Structure formats: C-alpha cells, structure tokens
Curated annotation (Swiss-Prot):
The gene is cysS. Keywords: Aminoacyl-tRNA synthetase, ATP-binding, Cytoplasm, Ligase, Metal-binding, Nucleotide-binding, Protein biosynthesis, Zinc. Zn(2+) binds at C28, C208, H233, E237. Binds 1 zinc ion per subunit. This is Cysteine--tRNA ligase. It comes from Methanococcus maripaludis (strain C6 / ATCC BAA-1332).
Amino acid sequence: MLKVYNTLTRKEEEFKPLNEKEVKMYVCGPTVYDHTHLGHGRTYVSFDIIRRYLEHIGYTVNLVINFTDIDDKIIKRANENGKNPKELSEQFITVFLNDMTTLKVKPADIYPKVTEHIPEIIAFIEKLIEKGFAYETENGVYFEVKKFENYGKLSNINLEDLFSGVRIETSEEKKNPEDFALWKTAKPGEPKWKSPFVEGRPGWHIECSAMSSKYLGEQFDIHGGGRDLSFPHHENEIAQSVAYSGKDWVNYWLHTGFVMVNGEKMSKSLGNFVTIEGISKEYDPEILRFFFIQRHYRSPIDYTAESITHVKNNLEKIYNVIENIRISLEKSEKSRVWGENEVLLYDILKNSKRNFYEAMNSDFNTVEALKSVFEVSNGVNKYLSLVKTPSEGLLLKAFDFFKIVGEIFGLFENYFKTSSESDDEEFIKFLIELRSDLRLQKNYEMSDKIRDGLKNLGYQIEDNPKEGTVFKKINI
C-alpha cells in the first residue's frame, strides 16, 4: 500500500487517486528567464521518480508542467538584454527542456504556457468576480483573501500570523494589504492583452489554477513543487481554485526540499547556483540523479564537490556489479545444484526486493530503498567471489532487480538494452574479433584505432590472458 506525505494535512496518508488507475498530477514549472540550476533539477528529478514509480506499480500518470512565460522577472531581464519578453522566454524554455532531457526526466504530457491561455485565465477571473471573491480596481483585479474562509490551511497559520513580518505588495486601491493580484495593468512598453477589466496581463498565481483546471479538471490528485512555493503561491492557488469551483481542489500536496550550499538555499538571488548545463559537462547525468536520491525528496540536500565525488564512486561500484553479472552470465549454469552460497544470495535478493518496495511505498523513501540496492550489490559481489560457476537463475534475478531499480530511479541505462542496442553489441563483438586478427598480423596501428574508437563510443576493451578480449560499457 502506497502512502504519501501530504503537506496539507502534515501526515502520511494512503494514496487513493480519484480514478482507480489514473493519476492526475500538476507540478509548477519554471519562470523562464534564466538557466536551470541544480535546485530546479532536484525538484523535477524527484517528481520524475515519483511519476516513474506510480507508473511502475500500474498507474497511468497524466502530468502537466507549466511555463510562466510572462512575468516581472522576464520583462526586466528582457529589457536588460535588449530582447523582447517572448524571445527571452522561448530561449529559456528550450534551455529547460534540453536540461530535462540531459537529466533523463521523462517529458510531461502537456507543457502549457501562460501566454497561450489568456482567454482561460480571463474567464477564471470573471467567475471569481461573479462569485464575490475578487474585485476590480482602476489598475487590475484582486482576490479578497478574507472572503476565503480556510486561507492559510496549507501553511498552518492564521491570516494575521501569516502576514506578520512578511513583505507583501501594498496599494491604496486594495481593500486589504493581503489581497493579491489576479490581473495587472500593463506599464508602458510591457506586453498586454485586452480584457473586460483593463489592458494588462495575469498575476502569477492565477495561471496555475486556470491551466490545471483546463487540463486536469476542477479536482485532481497531486500538486507538486519546491518547498518555497507553498506560501504564498500554493496557498493562493488553493484559495482561487476552491473559491472558483466550490470543491476540494487537490488531494495530495507534495513539496521538495532545497539544495543547500554552505548552509544556504541554492538560488539565483544569492548567486550561489550551479547550472544543469554547466555541471552536466563535468558529471554524467546519472551521477546527478544518484546524488538527488541520497536524501528523501522532502529533506534538504547539501551540495559540495566532495559529496558529488562520493556519490560518483558509489555509483561506479554498482555499475561494476551489474557488469560483473553480465560477464558472469556467460559462464553460469542453468542446472547448478544450489548450495549454501546460492541460498544466501537468494534470501538477500528476496528480502532486498521486499524492502525496496516497502521503502518506496513509504512516501517514496529513496534513502531506505538505496540500502536494498547496496545489500544486493554486496551480496552479488560476495557470491561471485566464492563460486566458479554461478547459478544462471540467481544472476538473472539479480539482473532483473537492478533493471527495476534503474527504471524507477532513471539509472543504469547503458546496461539494459533494447533489441537495437543488442544488435550494436553484436557489431562491437565483430570489431573486437577484427582487432584480434589485426593484432595477430601485427597491424597495431589499426587495432589501436579500433580500441580508441570503441572507447569514444563508451566501450572499454580489456585483453585478459584467461578469458580473451572482453569489453564493458563505461560512462563517457
């Protein structure tokens, strides 16, 4: 039974989607004015793993991630760079999507943009005005927070405490300081759209309510984002959406923890951020994914060069185990009679697989799940060191375990091949045989070219006096 931690209720709850086999999920996307950094990467990799696990246990996931492609920050950056806001936002949408591909994050089903949903946003605002939750002024439309009875439920504090010491937008035309903008009048030179109110553009919070309701309906299962979005963004989304429909909006609220640098949150405003584009030139994306799952998705994680190096070394140990299984399968026996060593490894595999699922069913606890991965790794290593002719069935069970882990965590991609990749492997074997013939003919120049070419493709050749020439997949 899957349980998830719900920020709204502050406890783990049994996961029951509205539709038995379908999960509707909305994750707040980026405001596209700059490069994606490691903090963003942590959020989207975390929800990618959550999505992968839900799909693994039988759900169909309908995932929506929005793009905020018009915003004060976008306008400011566009003016600084001498670009129009549309040009700038499209540039960084491309950067974001490329970064997600690099991180092996599966694409969302829909990536709606604010600028392409202005009619839906206007209609949403009109209904809020009609129902008495919003009011017009000369310069826009505001949501009247005091009209919404349960405001602050997500943040777990009352309205007075909520705004004590918090910097909020003030305006003489607002009824109350805490009221927030649904529609803003455009300043000279800014992008603007015609509306029944004033010519202008949407406020930040209304976009997610309008776009999620269009693609997922007035009620859906999971709303996610970084912890910093819980207030005011998600609090305001709840107010708008429940006021609009009169229904409970989202069943489960999930929030990811920060990536920390020297005790501070990684952020653009502090200038302590590391871009995905930059770090992926130095480290394989699987190392970054493996780094993120070292901590529970709700917990903060500290980024240091040392922590990445430590993660890299541990991941390479697992790669070596998977490669050793692949090589050992060639000398394994189907009918091997089981002895003490086989029974021991079988028990490790059975218990570790059970523990892995128990961990993932407990709010996607990757930290505990990883313990099972290392237990299997150690068990396989010990088994292969003790037997000369291993059991094929046991090795296939171990191989299958790593395949499942890889599918859920987005790891070990190079070790689990499609049929086309298997054809590639046959071609590589042919090249190795050709290289051996060239070496016998003492044509070392051509044989070295084959060796170096295969290395560039991610395959390392090892000449072993006992086993002949073998190859293994490496990360390049």
